[in-house]
Amino acid sequence: MLEQRIQQHFIDSADLKYQAAQTLSHPIAAAVQAVLACVTSGGKVLACGNGPSAAEAQQFAAFCVAGFERERPELAALALTSDNTLLTAAAGSHDATQQFARQVRALGQAGDVLLALTVHGNDPNLLAATEAAHERDMTVVVLAGRPGGKLAAMLRETDVLISVPHDRAARVREVHTLVLHCLSDGVDAQLLGEQEIPL
């Protein structure tokens, strides 16, 4: 019984990824172009999310700076979720919904990209960060579940929404990980050329 339950997780995850491949390839390609335009113009990616999505933000920043699967020059990226002192100071002395927005206002510049990761798209601190990014003329890339919540409604025509067609948080996060891999690989392919990665 337990093994069947475990196997079902694998099946459900694989099914969702297969079904989402065609739907998500276009917005992922648009996100690759947004990140590429940013970093090749001297800009940076600011990534944020809450809970497990915070870890995903840190993972993407690490891929940019330390590399993904191939050697390449470092790309400027920062996870806004990494500085515990700053985050707890903001939570203790200010409106906690502004914890990422303050960093966007301090660090963001026109041409930069804000990468916001969320399951439901209604996180008040991500909404505030998106508003701050728009004030700075930054492009916003959102990874969300279905249908993207309030965050999706805030996006401009130049922003990118990658909305995983599922409601279950675990499935959405599994696809987010794959999307971040596709995004990192796409940037590398555009910078370094197409190349098969050896096993």
Give short role names for the model-derived ranges:
Residues 81, 118, 144, 161-168:
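Short beta->alpha connector loops at strand-helix junctions that form conserved
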Residues 1-23:
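Generic N-terminal amphipathic, Lys/Arg-enriched alpha-helix
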Residues 106, 169-199:
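A charged, well-structured terminal subsegment
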Residues 143-158:
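Short, glycine/polar-rich helix-capping loops at beta-to-alpha or helix-loop-helix junctions
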Residues 130-137:
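Surface-exposed amphipathic alpha-helices with a cationic face
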Residues 53-58, 122-129, 151:
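Short glycine/serine/threonine-rich phosphate/pyrophosphate-binding segments
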Residues 34-108:
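Glycine-rich, small/polar surface segments that engage phosphate groups of diverse ligands
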